[in-house]
Amino acid sequence: PTVVCLLAATVVIWWGSLDNGFHYDDEHSIQLNIHLRLAPDLGEMKDGIKSYFSDPSTFSRDAKKGMYRPLLVSSFAFNHAANLAFGLDGYDVRGFHVINILIHAINGLLVCWFARLLWPSRKQIGLVAGLVFIAWPLGSEPVNYISSRSESLAALFYLLTMALYLAAQTDRRQRTYWACWLAMGAGLLTKSTTI
């Protein structure tokens, strides 16, 4: 019931943002970025994603604004290809907002898990923490502003890193510790502020 409650709350609170348009950095990093224009074809996606990991200039149409954020750029390209696969325009903003809302929901679930790991005897604290995170007005930027996905996706991996570390303290399995490092690495490949 906790997962369903948090997912439902996210949808109810943020569904109204689906038709919000692109703005600010969305123009150079998404709308005019030819590197994101991938068809829903596995070969083309593979080549595109490979280029995001080897060429920071793929971050923007303006090579001077290049940043090394391959997982973020991959998520934008995936959005473009998924929009096409669903019969939408590749740059239909609704597809981008659906992914941002999904990332926000996952972050709420991770906050819940993290709180439950901190206070294992008080399970309701996790639900409350997750709901507060999901509903907090400051969370509107990463949901409404597509380019701010860098913040929410980096937060996803950061929260996952912290939760896995706490989980590793109790289960003492080496693979949980290694999963911490993988999550941290994914965060760094999304945005360097994950450090």
Located regions from the model:
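Polytopic membrane enzymes that build or remodel cell-surface glycoconjugates and lipids
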Residues: 1-195
